């Protein structure tokens, strides 16, 4: 079946590339909410276009509240496999050599905002499903491609959708890297707050613990580490002002074994007299045992297609896996491909588009063999 999948993906590749260009030509940055458009009209229009393309391929489609788009195929089973990703994109930064919303092909590479993060990979998953359908494979379980519209700015779309809908039995999000990710760090924001009239304490705190520090986690007393993830990372420190209160927000990318209560207690130890510490927001870590069916199968799939070691790894990144149960990050970036998604001249090679579609089609097939 693997060779048939590889051949079928090759036949579909020209159409896949053209559809990626079409969807990347749409500006889907979040803008102000409007009636019927919770994350702005631009991303709603992009969602509808993606569903229109999928419908034209013969799939069942559903737009759920202009927040989530569902593409379905297979028997009417209660449980389902899923690929979950997003159509919203980050803002334009830096100087681009091409128009970020005119997908440009040059020397076998596509350039556009969202081509890698995450429109291109999601269309690889859509065409992976199409390849299996074209091969006449009889699906034992329903498969869904789930398009989101708010991953970059809060993941409120999936939090909202899964309040009333069943989580997938198994699946992945193509919004990270290869090989399969078995664990993601948590992401927490803590606030040091104090009255505005005590702002001098804030400046003293900044001078002592934040400014000119090479390692914020060490200077703040939260340099915890474990074998799985390594060291806790305080990655951002920003001043804020809120009415009669001011302070500092710290964002930590923390190992799964590090308790938030323990981190908060450590941060409190260095408070100035009028300061307090509070947890402002948190996304829990994602952790799967490495011998689970999902992780082992995706390791095998990667190794079969790429002919190289596919041992599962961890990541500091954050994806829909934090809010959608039973899915892991899997692709699309290959080894050595870093810092592409949010940068100027975002790119994805056509050969990588083809390889991703092969991997995802084979992943759907192999996961269904054990169900």
Walk through the language-model features, giving the residues of each.
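Acidic/His- and Gly-rich active-site-bordering loop/insert found
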Residues: 2-110
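Zn-dependent metallopeptidase/amidohydrolase metal-coordination segment
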Residues: 8, 301-302, 306-370
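Buried hydrophobic packing segments
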Residues: 50, 122-132, 161, 324, ...
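Active-site metal-coordination/substrate-binding segment of hydrolases
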Residues: 78-142, 147, 343-346, 350-355
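Midchain, well-structured core segments that form catalytic/ion-binding scaffolds
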Residues: 151-152, 156-268, 283
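Active-site-adjacent substrate-binding region
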Residues: 211-226, 283-323, 327-331
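Conserved short beta-strand edge segments in small beta-sheet-based binding/regulatory domains
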Residues: 273-281
């Amino acid at each position: 079946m693997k060779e048939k999948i590889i051949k079928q993906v090759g036949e579909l590749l020209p159409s896949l590339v053209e559809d990626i260009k079409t969807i990347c030509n749409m500006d889907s940055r979040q803008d102000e909410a409007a009636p019927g458009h919770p994350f702005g009209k631009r991303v709603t229009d992009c969602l509808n276009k993606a569903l229109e393309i999928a419908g034209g391929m013969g799939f069942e489609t559903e737009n759920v509240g202009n927040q989530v788009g569902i593409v379905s195929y297979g028997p009417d089973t209660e449980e389902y496999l899923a690929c979950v990703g997003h159509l919203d994109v980050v803002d334009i930064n830096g100087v681009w050599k091409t128009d970020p919303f005119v997908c440009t092909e040059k020397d076998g590479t596509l350039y556009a905002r969202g081509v890698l993060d995450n429109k291109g990979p999601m269309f690889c998953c859509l065409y992976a499903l199409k390849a299996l359908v074209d091969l006449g494979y009889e699906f034992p379980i329903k498969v869904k491609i789930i398009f989101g519209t708010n991953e970059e700015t809060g993941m409120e779309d999936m939090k909202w959708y899964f309040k009333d809908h069943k989580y997938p039995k198994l699946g992945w999000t193509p919004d990270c890297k290869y090989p399969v990710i078995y664990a993601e760090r948590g992401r927490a924001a803590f606030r040091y707050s104090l009255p505005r009239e005590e702002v001098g304490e804030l400046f003293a705190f900044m001078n002592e613990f934040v400014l000119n520090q090479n390692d914020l986690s060490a200077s703040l007393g939260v340099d915890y580490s474990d074998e799985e993830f390594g060291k806790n990372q305080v990655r951002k420190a920003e001043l804020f002002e809120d009415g009669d209160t001011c302070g500092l927000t710290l964002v930590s990318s923390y190992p799964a074994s590090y308790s938030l209560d323990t981190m908060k207690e450590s941060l409190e130890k260095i408070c100035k007299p009028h300061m307090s510490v509070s947890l402002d927001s948190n996304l829990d870590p994602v952790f799967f045992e490495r011998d689970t069916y999902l992780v082992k199968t995706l390791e095998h799939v990667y190794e079969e297609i790429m002919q190289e070691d596919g041992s599962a790894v961890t990541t500091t990144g954050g994806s829909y896996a934090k809010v959608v149960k039973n899915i892991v990050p899997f692709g699309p970036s290959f080894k050595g491909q870093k810092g592409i998604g949010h940068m100027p001249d975002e790119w994805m090679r056509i050969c990588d588009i083809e390889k991703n579609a092969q991997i995802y089609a084979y992943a759907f097939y192999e996961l269904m063999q054990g169900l």
